[in-house]
A protein has these predicted regions:
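Metal-dependent phosphate/diphosphate-handling catalytic cores characterized by acidic Asp/Glu clusters
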Residues: 42
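Exposed regions on extracellular, virion, or secretory-pathway luminal proteins
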Residues: 14-16, 47
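PP2C/PPM-type serine/threonine phosphatase catalytic core
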Residues: 2-3, 7-14, 21-25, 31, ...
Length: 344
């Protein structure tokens, strides 16, 4: 196995957040969120064949925490960029004045097996009742996806995503010590499709449970790719009631506002499920788009109009991340916040 690059770590104080920012350099392909606060990344990583050989060991050997390359290496990395995206940035903000713990997590896979460099996965998880389930998903979602990706020969991404949610929720039920912990999830899978008549297009698959949302921004408009699963939604309310569930004071079983999640097994009899909403859309290669994934600590406090204004008036994805989190704080958010900006 190729020897890893040396890891450079530095800590700086960000004027906006007064938070430690930990940045590391590596050639590895997986990025997860155990320590990162915020940084920008252009990928320069080796292939990932070993992940499919033993996905069950991925959380120990294949999953590298909090690793990126440094900003001054972006141009050097450019010849090896993943074709699915141009760059991405992210910020995680605990909001320590109000929150004792960080329950948000994310995982990112930037190169697929067999040097398949036109695909990528971005996954974001917002835990509640503790971080155990969001942490488990952070460490295991991508390895389970790769297992099914190989099994179903890459042909049915919707089926692969459904199997991932079902399998992981079943595993969580087996090992969880509490039925009061849970997590939302939003998964983005980027790929391309080629048609003899229409040519090649970028394809975005989005799967989610809960209220961790994703929107696609262009110069003219924005489109939400996730479906927000809350008891206040009429479709979710009808589904719950049709299945003999119950909503009390706008909460499923009188306990929780979201109606789909991983875990939260005490609410299963009240109508809570872990079946994802899945959306697929195509975009042109020659047009500029930004994907924004964020937890509800941001979406509940930053309007679509405010996000659109920020994206239209700034070109740098890291700066957009900072401005969005600043706006959420300014508008009164007291929650953990995670924001990922993907420049397509």
């Amino acid at each position: 196995m190729e020897k890893r690059n040396s890891v450079d770590t530095f800590i700086k104080k960000n004027q906006n957040f007064e938070e430690k920012v930990i940045v590391r350099r590596t050639s590895d392909l997986l990025l997860t969120s155990k320590q990162n606060k915020g940084l920008k990344y252009l990928n320069n990583q080796k292939n990932s064949k070993e992940l499919l050989k033993s996905p069950s060991k991925n959380k120990i050997k294949g999953l590298i925490n909090s690793n990126t390359i440094l900003e001054n290496e972006f141009k050097q990395a450019a010849p090896n960029l993943n074709k699915a995206f141009k760059d991405f940035s992210f910020i995680q903000f605990q909001n320590e004045s109000y929150r004792d713990y960080m329950e948000d997590r994310f995982s990112i896979l930037m190169n697929f097996p067999n040097d398949d460099n036109d695909k990528a996965i971005f996954a974001i998880f917002d835990g509640h009742g503790g971080s155990s389930i969001s942490e488990y998903l952070c460490e295991n979602f991508i390895s389970v996806f790769l297992k099914y990706y190989q099994k179903y020969e890459k042909q049915n991404i919707e089926k692969i995503l459904q199997k991932c949610f079902s399998t992981l929720n079943d595993e969580i039920k087996k090992i969880s010590k509490s039925d009061e912990m849970g997590s939302t999830a939003t998964i983005i899978f980027l790929t391309k499709e080629t048609n003899q008549l229409l040519g090649s297009k970028k394809i975005i698959y989005c799967a989610n449970v809960g209220d961790t949302n994703c929107e696609l921004f262009s110069k003219n408009n924005c489109k939400r790719l996730t479906y927000e699963h809350r008891c206040s939604d009429s479709i979710e309310e009808n589904r719950i009631k049709k299945n003999n569930g119950n909503i009390i004071n706008g909460r499923i079983g009188g306990r929780m506002e979201i109606s789909r999640s991983f875990g939260d097994f005490r609410l299963k009899d009240y109508g809570l499920i872990c079946e994802p909403s899945i959306n697929k859309m195509s975009i042109n290669f020659n047009e500029k788009y930004l994907l924004i994934l964020a937890t509800d600590g941001i979406w509940d406090f930053v309007s679509e109009e405010e996000m659109f204004f920020i994206t239209m008036n700034n070109n740098d994805s890291m700066e957009i991340c900072k401005l969005i989190v600043d706006k959420a704080k300014e508008n009164g958010s007291t929650d953990n916040m995670t924001c990922i900006i993907i420049n397509l």
